[in-house]
Amino acid sequence: MTALQSDLISAIRSIPDYPKPGVMFRDITTLLGNPRAFRRAIDELVHPYAGTKVDKVAGIEARGFILGGAIAHQLSAGFIPIRKRGKLPHDTVRIAYSLEYGVDEMEMHRDAVVPGDKVILVDDLIATGGTAEGAAKLLQQMGAEIVAACFIIDLPELGGRRKLEALGVNVRTLIEFEGH
């Protein structure tokens, strides 16, 4: 484990049995509240793409907005919010995606992506990958080229990374936690 990984892990609060028994919730709000850890996480997520053409960063509601906005700023890119259905005010495009216990829908503004835009997809954590897979498919349907999908945390036992890789998306994560 690198010093960076150790620092990030120590900046994340783990809450047992939330939101339900048997789940270990990884709360990044403590990382966000720690200026040094927050900067290091953003810098590390941005580093591989500095000097790469990135037109937009797409953040998945809600923590992906925080991380994605900071990454977009550092890359001088635009930002695309990907939101739950009914939360955006203009003409939207929508996709249904699978959750652990059902189906939900997310959407983005129809004019948020120009075909050929190079986009980085961002969220705080990848677990089963249903939400990230839905967001990636939505971006691809609109003609975006996904440069990468970036997450602070990977829960590898849940297989989300494989879903994105099956779509041809390069996945970048900073730390892993075993279990869920």
Curated annotation (Swiss-Prot):
SUPFAM superfamilies xrefs: PRTase-like
GO CC terms of this entry: cytoplasm
Which reaction equation describes what this protein catalyses?
AMP + diphosphate = 5-phospho-alpha-D-ribose 1-diphosphate + adenine
GO molecular function annotation = adenine binding; adenine phosphoribosyltransferase activity; AMP binding
- GO biological process per UniProt: adenine salvage; AMP salvage; purine ribonucleoside salvage
- One Pfam family per UniProt: Pribosyltran
Which InterPro entries does this one have?
Ade_phspho_trans (IPR005764), PRibTrfase_dom (IPR000836), PRTase-like (IPR029057), UPRTase/APRTase (IPR050054)
What keywords sit in the KW lines? Cytoplasm, Glycosyltransferase, Purine salvage, Transferase
This protein's record includes keyword Glycosyltransferase: yes
Q: Which pathway does UniProt place it in?
A: Purine metabolism; AMP biosynthesis via salvage pathway; AMP from adenine: step 1/1
Compartments, as annotated in UniProt: Cytoplasm
Instruction: Give the matching PROSITE patterns.
Output: PUR_PYR_PR_TRANSFER
UniProt-listed Enzyme Commission number(s):
2.4.2.7
Which PANTHER family does the protein's record reference? ADENINE PHOSPHORIBOSYLTRANSFERASE
Subunit structure comment from the entry = Homodimer.
- NCBIfam families assigned to the protein according to its UniProt record, in alphabetical order: apt (TIGR01090), PRK02304.1-3 (NF002634), PRK02304.1-5 (NF002636)
Report the family membership.
Belongs to the purine/pyrimidine phosphoribosyltransferase family.
What role does it play?
Catalyzes a salvage reaction resulting in the formation of AMP, that is energically less costly than de novo synthesis.
Identify this protein by name: Adenine phosphoribosyltransferase
Q: Give the originating organism.
A: Sinorhizobium medicae (strain WSM419)
